[in-house]
């Protein structure tokens, strides 16, 4: 969590590369049962955050023995909000699960309740540049996080020899050029808030644009699937980055050795889609290519079992545990 003003909230949505949502807490209280929850919520001044004609939805996360069903928490919250407006003689607000005017989050830990407004809308991993995808594409925020862990700063060429739909390539380009990840999005939820300041958001975007920088190197992607290559090229063009990203149709073992040290980051096909013997052979091939073609370069390889690294056969400097969706890697 962090504390800041309205400008920082806008900037967090527009510029953060590894956040999924930016929530603004608006009320905290205690409740030991659903009736107390209803009473506490109904007591709030909902007109400070929405009009009766606005649509809304609740997202709930519950860690409590007193509240065993998160959906029921959402129902009681909905009743409290609707009753607040109806009893004031206003229109009955409508629930809309898809892209509501206001999305509220309720988090309950034991008897501590936090009500927050979602300022983002769609998850921030949905940058806006992905117009096509391959099977099980990597999340944009995961890709950005891995690149930040790898200390990618655009000071060398970048290589992903198993690029799939191009997520790592594009996120690497955004970082290298200092492009804000939110610059591709059509909108954010805070733009529909009652206190939205369009001029302030324009200032945030102008300040982000002032941080753009030249990238003097190149980003190379390849994949042995022609369909993946087509998807990656399409996404690269949509992002307007085809001047610094080249995507080729070739397998990793056919990739030429770079002329100078590079940063290589790749997410090989994982276990659910390959036979055990195929996985072992794949990672052994990766190790051989790294040894012969990428001496002096830095490589970050995503793997899903410790033995995958054993198959690579090279000494590792660091291993970092993370989640790719529901898969530990």
Protein language model features and the residues they cover:
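S-adenosyl-L-methionine
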Residues: 1-20, 60, 64-72, 108-157, ...
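Non-catalytic nucleic-acid substrate-recognition regions in nucleic-acid-modifying enzymes
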Residues: 1-102
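Nucleotide donor/acceptor-binding cores
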Residues: 53-56, 156, 262
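Hydrophobic beta-strand segments of well-ordered beta-sheets in folded domains
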Residues: 54-57, 219, 298-299
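Short, surface-exposed charged micro-motifs
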Residues: 103-107
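Conserved S-adenosyl-L-methionine
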Residues: 138-257, 272, 280-282
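C-terminal catalytic and target-recognition region of SAM-dependent MTase-like enzymes
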Residues: 250-329
């Amino acid at each position: 969590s962090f504390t800041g003003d309205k400008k920082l909230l806008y900037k967090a949505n527009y510029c953060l590369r590894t956040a999924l949502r930016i929530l603004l807490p608006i009320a905290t209280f205690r409740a030991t049962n659903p009736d107390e929850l209803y009473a506490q919520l109904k007591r709030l001044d909902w007109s400070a955050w929405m009009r009766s004609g606005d649509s809304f939805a609740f997202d709930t996360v519950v860690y409590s023995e007193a509240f065993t069903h998160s959906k029921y928490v959402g129902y009681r919250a909905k009743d409290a909000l609707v009753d607040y407006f109806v009893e004031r003689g206003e229109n009955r607000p409508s629930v809309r699960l898809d892209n509501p005017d206001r999305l509220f989050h309720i988090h309950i830990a034991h008897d501590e309740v936090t009500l927050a407004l979602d300022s983002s809308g769609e998850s921030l991993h949905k940058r806006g540049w992905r117009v096509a995808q391959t099977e099980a594409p990597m999340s944009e925020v995961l890709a950005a996080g891995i690149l930040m862990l790898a200390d990618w700063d655009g000071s060398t060429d970048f290589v992903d020899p198993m690029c799939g739909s191009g997520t790592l390539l594009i996120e690497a380009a955004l970082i290298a050029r200092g492009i804000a990840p939110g610059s591709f999005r059509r909108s954010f939820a805070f733009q529909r808030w009652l206190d939205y300041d369009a001029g302030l958001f324009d200032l945030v975007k102008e300040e982000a644009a002032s941080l753009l920088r030249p990238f003097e190197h190149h980003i190379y992607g390849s994949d042995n699937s022609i369909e993946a290559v087509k998807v990656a090229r399409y996404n690269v063009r949509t992002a307007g980055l085809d001047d610094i990203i080249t995507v080729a149709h070739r397998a990793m073992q056919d990739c030429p050795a770079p002329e100078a040290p590079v940063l290589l980051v790749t997410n090989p096909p994982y276990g659910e889609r390959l036979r055990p013997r195929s996985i072992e052979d794949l990672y052994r091939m990766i190790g051989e290519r790294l040894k012969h073609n990428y001496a002096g370069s830095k490589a970050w390889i995503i793997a899903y079992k410790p033995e995958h690294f054993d198959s690579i056969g090279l000494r590792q400097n660091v291993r970092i545990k993370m989640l790719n969706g529901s898969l530990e890697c």
